């Protein structure tokens, strides 16, 4: 059984641009435009899916569908369990990188 807290963290704490970057060539084409991260909607094929940075949810302005990280991987033919497992790995890697970048440098001993 997958913990609901893990699903919440995957949806909210792993930025969609990080997920799409991790997918590489397998992921949808994307770009920054007018301060928003946009990508080709995997459902309709239009470059009109835009990520709202406040809630980490993508909305396609062509087909009117919403996507989170899990939905994105499922739309790319991952099954639910494989998607959650992979996204959990990427979330852990992302959080480790974030923690490493925020760690202050220790001053040299006197």
Locate predicted features.
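N-terminal structured subdomain of primase-like DNA metabolism proteins
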Residues: 1-110
């Amino acid at each position: 059984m997958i913990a609901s807290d893990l699903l919440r963290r995957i949806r909210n704490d792993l930025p969609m641009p990080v997920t799409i970057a991790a997918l590489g060539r397998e992921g949808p084409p994307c770009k920054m435009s007018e301060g928003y991260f946009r990508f080709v909607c995997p459902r309709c094929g239009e470059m009109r899916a835009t990520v709202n940075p406040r809630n980490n949810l993508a909305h396609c302005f062509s087909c009117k569908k919403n996507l989170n990280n899990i939905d994105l991987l499922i739309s790319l033919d991952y099954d639910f369990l494989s998607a959650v497992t992979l996204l959990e790995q990427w979330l852990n890697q992302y959080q480790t990188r974030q923690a490493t970048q925020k760690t202050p440098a220790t001053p040299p001993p006197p």
